[in-house]
Amino acid sequence: MEKIILVKPDLSYADEIIKYKEESLKENPLINGAAGLNNFSSIEDWLEELKKRSSQETVPEGLVPSSTFLGVREKDNYIVGMIDIRHYLNEFLKQFGGNIGYSVRKSKRNKGYAKQMLKLALEKCKDLKMKKVLITCDEDNIASEKVILSANAKFEDIRCIDGENIKEK
């Protein structure tokens, strides 16, 4: 398994971010853990949004401060995933989404990258002095459930949101 590091997105990764976005959007119109990347036509605008989201003073209304990272293979700077840490929970995130959202490039799944990314993100949560971290997944997303449980998570419950069951850990 190749070693992954978490890095803050910047313009030096622009081409790789675009490729990641394009590959992800072929599968789903929403890119989990990417802080709304799917809503931006330019990487510059998305990076500006990440700056706004990083601070309580500038976070857009309805959101909470967050830190977004690229999961990058250390040997070649290839983006295998993205992960977003929400610094605390609002009412929406308590029910849907939790503190951490992530995605792994479809072509790089089942290689242990998500486990590495989550482990590294949980270290970042400690740095942020977060005492408890809520991570959710769809009930039928067995791969994500295994990733979450690999981080010594404790199953909390299953919640029905808009007719879909969501597992909380």
Predicted regions located by residue number:
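Conserved beta-strand-loop-alpha-helix junction that forms the acyl-donor binding cleft
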Residues: 135-145
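Conserved GNAT acetyl-CoA-binding A-motif
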Residues: 125-136
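Conserved acetyl-CoA-binding loop-helix of GNAT-fold acetyltransferases
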Residues: 101-104, 110-123, 127, 146-150
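Short coil/turn motifs at secondary-structure junctions
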Residues: 88-90, 107, 140
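GNAT-family acyltransferases
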Residues: 1-99
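Short beta-strand element of the conserved SAM-dependent methyltransferase core
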Residues: 71, 168-169
